[in-house]
A protein has these predicted regions:
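Positively charged, helix-rich recognition surfaces that bind polyanionic ligands
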Residues: 1-204
Length: 204
């Protein structure tokens, strides 16, 4: 099935973002991105069509396979565009945790990593932030999952190692704060961004 695309280039005047707050973003596999405010976007576009894609592949329907892949690509791009646009419109600074996606693509998590679209989302956030005149930072996300965003400790109760990947909620054994795994990481990423900006360190 042939596909035709009509592209129109227009010049628009970028409007500065009216936002005053900063947010941290944790990139993940279960959710493509989790914001320090608690907002999340699921990134399972491929998974939604995996069954239909498998049927088409086994039946050797090449046109159907191409059509499904095109649909997945368009849904991913549209979802990430909407998510990134809303963030940039409302915030004054966006801090993203650095993820070694190139390494994960070579592991058994490759399919989920590619489906999440981290690189695409980061690129969208970066150029949209630049257009809106807001701060965009990428920070080292080491220990952001294990560190309690409330008291700053790395308690024994925090998720660690491969076994910790299954833990979605945990309680800090030091201050008794209950954490959503990804929201906690996003809050720590935001804190790391504040420290970098306060020290005048440039973007990674």
């Amino acid at each position: 099935r042939g596909r035709w695309y009509f592209n129109v280039a227009v010049q628009v005047q970028c409007q500065p973002s009216p936002g005053t707050a900063a947010v941290g973003i944790d990139l993940g596999l279960k959710e493509c991105a989790t914001v320090s405010t608690g907002d999340k976007i699921e990134g399972r576009w491929y998974r939604q069509h995996e069954k239909a894609l498998g049927i088409a592949q086994r039946a050797k329907k090449k046109n159907r396979v191409r059509a499904i892949h095109a649909k997945i690509k368009n849904q991913r791009k549209d979802g990430l565009h909407q998510f990134s646009t809303q963030l940039v419109k409302k915030k004054a600074a966006i801090i993203v945790g650095e993820v070694a996606s190139a390494k994960l693509v070579k592991t058994r998590m490759a399919k989920s990593t590619l489906d999440a679209g981290w690189s695409m989302l980061q690129a969208m956030l970066e150029y949209k932030s630049h257009q809106a005149g807001i701060v965009f930072e990428v920070v080292n996300e080491s220990y952001t999952t294990q560190t309690c965003s409330c008291c700053g400790a790395i308690p024994a109760s925090s998720p660690k190692g491969r076994a910790g990947l299954r833990i979605r909620e945990w309680t800090c054994s030091e201050c008794a704060t209950v954490h959503d795994r990804d929201v906690n990481a996003a809050k720590n990423i935001l804190a790391a961004g504040h420290r970098r900006m306060a020290a005048g360190i440039s973007v990674l």
